[in-house]
Amino acid sequence: MPPSGLRLLPLLLPLPWLLVLTPGRPAAGLSTCKTIDMELVKRKRIEAIRGQILSKLRLASPPSQGEVPPGPLPEAVLALYNSTRDRVAGESADPEPEPEADYYAKEVTRVLMVDRNNAIYDKTKDITHSIYMFFNTSDIREAVPEPPLLSRAELRLQRFKSTVEQHVELYQKYSNNSWRYLGNRLLTPTDTPEWLSFDVTGVVRQWLNQGDGIQGFRFSAHCSCDSKDNVLHVEINGISPKRRGDLGTIHDMNRPFLLLMATPLERAQHLHSSRHRRALDTNYCFSSTEKNCCVRQLYIDFRKDLGWKWIHEPKGYHANFCLGPCPYIWSLDTQYSKVLALYNQHNPGASASPCCVPQALEPLPIVYYVGRKPKVEQLSNMIVRSCKCS
């Protein structure tokens, strides 16, 4: 028989130790966490980013904003920035969809381009080498609330019958009236109207990751160096001169549009919760009531949030942050919890459970001015892409 002192040991331990040393009982039952003030968390994240950017650029304070020259960036600087951003985007290619998420039906939505009577088209009406198609990102966001929900996006436009063969190109609108090349196509003569389709999934995801506004595409004639014919000979339904009467109504209804295929939010929440059982650290929060560790979206507008005008590009970015509790379960596969409990007894300032921290981070290219000289820099580890419990 063991000594009586050992038999009485459990009775001498304080109540918390009895709970910690009782197998099968989750430590989460002891939680006394208060409700999180999300606005306070966001403000602290914004202030942390302010210091982070200045520190990475080795600046004690923001450059004088009165020295920033007006007008667009020099073409060489803009080209360098665009190529840097494209390289970063290429390195962070979208992951393959999970089989379970890919199994379920996608909701299909059509988002029409902004009506041609909108003033945004005024500067483009007399241009003969291109046609322009603008979209309101708030309309896109109504159909797809979160970027991860988007499965596919296509730009659809209907061309009228044509007797001309022409090489055409598609561009994505960037700021400062610059355009990013997306692809090209050879259009052959046709006796009937024909629908053209372009995969723009990556572009629409970028728009969803930015603030609301007007974004667009340019559909242009290919300009070869040895050709003087730089006129687009393709007529597009909804953009070319309107027909009268009923034909005009049909013409307007068939104007270019985005065809969006996305997982409905309520279905995504179900898939998201099931994925948590397998991988807690690779998901965005699909609602404000998310209960576990995940990526919370946070868009930083340099002017509105930081009061900065000296960063010329981009105007802002999705910094994001990690938030949410991490499971602290007593089970056969988490016996290290015993060690953590003992560690905490001797280190009261240490965390009593795993913390929700960034796992994957991406860089942010920026263009800023030092005096009147523009500089292109890439700031490392600025965008939170996934979180983990650690």
UniProtKB/Swiss-Prot annotation:
Record function comment: Transforming growth factor beta-1 proprotein: Precursor of the Latency-associated peptide (LAP) and Transforming growth factor beta-1 (TGF-beta-1) chains, which constitute the regulatory and active subunit of TGF-beta-1, respectively.
Similarity-based family: Belongs to the TGF-beta family.
Stretch list, region Arm domain: 75-271
Residues bearing glycans: 82, 136, 176
Tissue: Abundant in the bone matrix. Expressed in cardiomyocytes.
Single GO MF descriptor: growth factor activity
Keyword tags: Cleavage on pair of basic residues, Disulfide bond, Extracellular matrix, Glycoprotein, Growth factor, Mitogen, Secreted, Signal
Signal peptide positions (record): 1-29
A GO CC term assigned to this protein in UniProt: blood microparticle
Site (Cleavage) location in chain: 278-279
Record region (Straightjacket domain): 30-74
Pfam families: TGF_beta, TGFb_propeptide
Assembly notes: Homodimer; disulfide-linked. Interacts with the serine proteases, HTRA1 and HTRA3: the interaction with either inhibits TGFB1-mediated signaling and the HTRA protease activity is required for this inhibition. May interact with THSD4; this interaction may lead to sequestration by FBN1 microfibril assembly and attenuation of TGFB signaling. Interacts with CD109, DPT and ASPN. Interacts with EFEMP2. Interacts with TSKU; the interaction contributes to regulation of the hair cycle. Interacts with TGFBR3.
This protein's encoding gene: Tgfb1
Segments of this protein annotated with the region Bowtie tail: 226-252
Sequence motif: Cell attachment site, positions: 244-246
Protein name (database record): Transforming growth factor beta-1 proprotein
Disulfide-linked positions: 285-294, 293-356, 322-387, 326-389
Modifications after synthesis and translation: Transforming growth factor beta-1 proprotein: The precursor proprotein is cleaved in the Golgi apparatus by FURIN to form Transforming growth factor beta-1 (TGF-beta-1) and Latency-associated peptide (LAP) chains, which remain non-covalently linked, rendering TGF-beta-1 inactive.
Listed PANTHER family: TGF-BETA FAMILY, TRANSFORMING GROWTH FACTOR BETA-1 PROPROTEIN
GO biological process, one term: ATP biosynthetic process
